[in-house]
């Protein structure tokens, strides 16, 4: 089967935003205008196509990234049909993992901001993730029809809060209830959409007289930004020559693709204005798969030899599995992005990460949660496979005869955990299956069992994250569970270096004995660095034979899981083995493992051990009247207020607060502010816990 749409006419984009910026509504409008959806789904009616889990419709927030495909030929049918693959990503910080995954497989993104709220905390998180993967983006300032809407203030915030270079492509005509359309700053015409047909048709009009000067000013700003794309254009511009529309567009496209500027559009998705022009901007300025650099990877040859794949059907097949979802009808759905080559349903491919072969049973293209079966997918496509057995998020799938491991995604460590048990003994096994299935879907969700108490522990990125997963277990797997009190994921480390710590394990009383003897140094590593643990072998002259060195490393590593101070994982530590002794007959791996763990425990407790606690970045929006109460409460929670910003509706307070002090904060904040304040929080870093706090935690752990 030949390719139906040339790859140059593909756009793989994500739609990303803060909660309530109107992202799902924007996606719905895109589906409507591109002709996929005949009745527009409204989030507040709980019918939006992209929000397909029951819980999402109840809570009105997007939890999983639904992927869907649409075609667009332009507002005035000025383009050949382009294929737009859209990934709708959640805006809540507890689901950052979903955003991270989708950013990894996108070529471009549309950042949706609320014209009233502007750039909010989650917007900054999403921005950092887009920077990490070098994703070119454009912005859409939504909700221009709302009270307090201010387009230019949002443009200014993109500059100051995100340290970006925003360049408006449009300015709004009117605002709040007087918002009627936009001025196209390239054509220098106003666009008015037809309300009778929900904005499908539009007319160009003259720019209203009161906007003429402002439009002129921003038009010049746009032309100057375009001219900076090349010396030739700059010379032309400085020489007073007019730049043609084609020159302006191609120059702006180049600068967007180079991540030098962010083009800003505006509108009101709810009122059917502006989304159409934003879609045109997606086609004109965001990259096709062929515009982005070749995807990097390594060969699975044990030497990590660098390799790459270009977006072409001619190259060997390679794809990245970026999401696993459980479907009630077909079991596991594996969403994947094809970077090169072609794959057909029925083909067998390799998962080089696990060195296993996988067969593509069926391939489906998703439109939110409706699926359409297809025979093949090619470079640039995003689809889902049914029938893959052992693939987890971030795995590569590739041609058997041309293996490559594509760059993996990095997932955050969980910061909160709770104990969970089924309500009935009969559900024990069902709960185990359900939790493992959920952990396979979501790499930031971990399941483990507490060795001492035998309890099952689940860990994740926040209270909401765990609530949603427990809720899904109830609905999808019909398992009722009791959930314990949230526990904080503390860590242990040392503050000082300690040298020449000895560990000796000797049992020699007739017969085969045990003998292991090690001398190690322990030193702290920089906090939050690349590695949590480093082992250095500096043994000379064979005082410990080579075959026992891994056992020493292993003995220390086993101690890291449960630290000597209070049984929490140990981080940021370097161990150096430099001396020891052995016995020809009695030495064994197990003896060296025990000796190493003894030395580690003793050394750790002498090297000024400390407890680390997770610190959260918290942002609170509150009316001014409640400022004093909110700040007073943050101080009581050991919070550190970093700064404040003005909002049309009050203030934004930015603070750092230990996670341990934030449980139940949503309820407390509601009662302090009569429900008028809102907050968001995300993990920031680990800090040393104050000694009185650490002491209480250590004693509580010992009492267990």
From Swiss-Prot:
Belongs to the TRAFAC class translation factor GTPase superfamily. Classic translation factor GTPase family. EF-G/EF-2 subfamily. Keywords: Cytoplasm, Elongation factor, GTP-binding, Nucleotide-binding, Protein biosynthesis. One of its GO terms (cellular component) is cytoplasm. Pfam families: EFG_C (PF00679), EFG_III (PF14492), EFG_IV (PF03764), GTP_EFTU (PF00009), GTP_EFTU_D2 (PF03144). Residues 8-290 form the tr-type G domain. Catalyzes the GTP-dependent ribosomal translocation step during translation elongation. During this step, the ribosome changes from the pre-translocational (PRE) to the post-translocational (POST) state as the newly formed A-site-bound peptidyl-tRNA and P-site-bound deacylated tRNA move to the P and E sites, respectively. Catalyzes the coordinated movement of the two tRNA molecules, the mRNA and conformational changes in the ribosome. InterPro entries: EFG_II, EFG_III, EFG_III/V, EFG_IV, EFG_V, EFG_V-like, EFTu-like_2, G_TR_CS. It is found in: Cytoplasm. PROSITE patterns: G_TR_1, G_TR_2. This is Elongation factor G. Its main location: cytoplasm. GO terms for molecular function: GTP binding; GTPase activity; guanosine tetraphosphate binding; translation elongation factor activity. GTP binds at residues 17-24, 88-92, 142-145. The gene is fusA. GO terms for biological process: ribosome disassembly. SMART domains: EFG_C (SM00838), EFG_IV (SM00889).
């Amino acid at each position: 089967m030949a390719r139906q749409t040339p790859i140059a006419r593909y756009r793989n984009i994500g739609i990303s935003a803060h909660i309530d910026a109107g992202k799902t509504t924007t996606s719905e409008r895109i589906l409507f205008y591109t002709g996929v959806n005949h009745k527009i789904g409204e989030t507040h009616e709980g019918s939006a196509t992209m929000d397909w889990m029951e819980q999402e419709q109840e809570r009105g927030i997007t939890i999983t990234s639904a992927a869907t495909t649409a075609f667009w030929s332009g507002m005035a049918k000025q383009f050949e049909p382009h294929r737009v693959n859209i990934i709708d990503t959640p805006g809540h910080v507890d689901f950052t993992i979903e955003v991270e995954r989708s950013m990894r497989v996108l070529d471009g993104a549309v950042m949706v901001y609320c014209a009233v709220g502007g750039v909010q905390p989650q917007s900054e998180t999403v921005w950092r993730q887009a920077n990490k993967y070098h994703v070119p983006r454009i912005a859409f300032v939504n909700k221009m029809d709302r009270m307090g809407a201010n387009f230019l203030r949002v443009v200014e915030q993109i500059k100051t809060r995100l340290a970006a270079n925003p360049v408006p492509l449009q300015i709004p005509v009117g605002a709040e209830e007087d918002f009627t359309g936009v001025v196209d700053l390239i054509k220098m015409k106003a666009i008015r959409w037809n309300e009778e047909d929900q904005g499908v048709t539009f007319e160009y009009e003259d720019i209203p007289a009161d906007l003429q000067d402002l439009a002129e000013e921003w038009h010049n700003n746009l032309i100057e930004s375009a001219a900076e794309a090349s010396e030739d254009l700059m010379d032309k511009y400085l020489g007073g020559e007019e730049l043609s529309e084609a020159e302006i567009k191609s120059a702006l496209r180049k600068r967007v693709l180079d991540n030098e500027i962010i083009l800003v559009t505006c509108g009101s998705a709810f009122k059917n204005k502006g989304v159409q022009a934003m879609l045109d901007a997606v086609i004109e300025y965001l990259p096709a798969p062929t515009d982005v650099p070749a995807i990097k990877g390594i060969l699975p040859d044990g030497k990590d030899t660098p390799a790459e794949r270009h977006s072409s059907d001619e190259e060997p097949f390679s794809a990245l599995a970026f999401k696993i979802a459980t479907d009630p009808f077909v079991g596991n759905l594996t969403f994947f992005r094809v970077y090169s080559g072609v794959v057909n349903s029925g083909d067998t491919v390799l998962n080089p990460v696990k060195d296993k072969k996988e067969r593509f049973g069926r391939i489906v293209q998703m439109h939110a949660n409706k699926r359409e079966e297809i025979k093949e997918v090619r470079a640039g496509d995003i689809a889902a496979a049914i029938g893959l057995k052992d693939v987890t998020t971030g795995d590569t799938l590739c041609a058997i005869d041309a293996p490559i491991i594509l760059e993996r995604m990095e997932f955050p460590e969980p910061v909160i955990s709770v104990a969970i048990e089924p309500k009935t003994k009969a559900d024990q096994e069902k709960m185990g299956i359900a939790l493992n299935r959920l952990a396979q879907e979501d790499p930031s969700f971990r399941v483990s069992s507490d060795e001492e108490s035998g309890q099952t522990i689940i860990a994740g990125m926040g209270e909401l994250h765990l609530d949603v997963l427990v809720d899904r277990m109830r609905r999808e797997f019909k398992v009722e569970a009791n959930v314990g009190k949230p526990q904080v994921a503390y860590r242990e480390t040392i503050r000082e270096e300690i040298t020449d710590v000895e560990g000796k394990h000797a049992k020699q009383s007739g017969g085969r004995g045990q003998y292991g003897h090690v001398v190690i140094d322990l030193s702290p590593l920089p906090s939050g660095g690349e590695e949590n643990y480093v082992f250095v072998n500096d043994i000379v002259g064979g005082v410990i034979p080579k075959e026992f060195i891994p056992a020493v490393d292993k003995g220390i590593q086993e101690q890291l899981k449960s630290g000597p101070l209070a049984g929490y994982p140990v981080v940021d530590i370097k161990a150096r083995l430099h001396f020891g002794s052995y016995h020809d007959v009695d030495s064994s791996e197990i003896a060296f493992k025990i000796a190493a763990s003894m030395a580690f425990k003793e050394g750790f407790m002498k090297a000024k051990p400390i407890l680390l606690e997770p610190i959260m970045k918290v942002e609170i929006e509150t009316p001014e009247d409640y400022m004093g109460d909110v700040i007073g409460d943050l101080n009581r929670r050991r919070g550190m207020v970093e700064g404040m910003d003005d909002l049309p509706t009050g203030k934004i307070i930015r603070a750092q607060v230990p996670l341990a002090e934030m449980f139940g904060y949503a309820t407390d904040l509601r009662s302090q502010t009569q429900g008028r304040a809102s907050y968001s929080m995300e993990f920031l870093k680990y800090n040393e816990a104050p000694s009185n706090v650490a002491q209480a935690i250590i004693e509580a752990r010992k009492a267990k």
